[in-house]
Amino acid sequence: ATIIYPSPIFGPIHSRRLGISLGINLQPADGKSCSFDCIYCECGYNADHRPTLPRPTREAVREALEAKLIEMRDSGTAPDVLTFAGNGEPTGHPHFAEIIDDTIALRDKYFPAAKVSVLRNSTFVHRPQVHDALMKVDNNILKLDTVDIDYIRKVDRPVNPHYNVDDIIAGLRSFNGHVIVQTMFMKGRMGTDDVDNTSDRFVAPWL
């Protein structure tokens, strides 16, 4: 079953990686909007979940986040992390940089020990305002499933036909180590296509 997350705030949930995670979803609450259309996405395919609602505004995100943090404080539940995730690519929001600033300010006010994490697919690493915002967060978690462009087009299915993996790699390097690279290794078939990326052909260049 696919998952469409509430917006702009969901959880908290218990993450094996991150601990008690309060989710921040910058996509519409009724669908998926993403610069990738990955075959393994838990939110399903883009075409099957077209949103009709707009993205939440910067103000709506700030107000909802503060209300939830107050609720968690009053209940004695401290988040380990505030995580940007949800129904698509968070850095595609037109006010992503400002929302990051708001989130850090609210984190510092209510739960200064909590981390701020961003889970993203690396599509917009070339945008200066996105890059600068990600340098401010604690966990800048970027996806790169492989360096093989044919595999990326088959499995990650970027919406932009001009997607260039060399540009993405250059973008990852531009963070000078302030980055966590995550990948999806898998075996299997998608229809008639082999989607195994665990062989040396894929792993050696990735390393």
Name what the model sees in each region.
Residues 26, 84-86, 183:
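Short glycine-centered, acidic/aromatic-flanked micro-motifs in structured strand/loop junctions
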Residues 33, 74-78, 110-113:
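Short helix-terminating capping/connector loops at secondary-structure junctions
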Residues 31, 89-90:
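Short strand->helix junction
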Residues 17-60:
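Canonical Radical SAM [4Fe-4S] cluster-binding loop centered on the CxxxCxxC motif
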Residues 45-81, 98:
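Conserved alpha-helical substructure of the radical SAM core
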Residues 92-207:
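Conserved AdoMet/S-adenosylmethionine-binding subsite of the radical SAM
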Residues 83-89, 121:
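Glycine-rich beta-strand-to-loop/alpha-helix junction loops that act as flexible
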Residues 1-17, 63, 70, 193-207:
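Auxiliary Fe-S-binding modules of radical SAM enzymes
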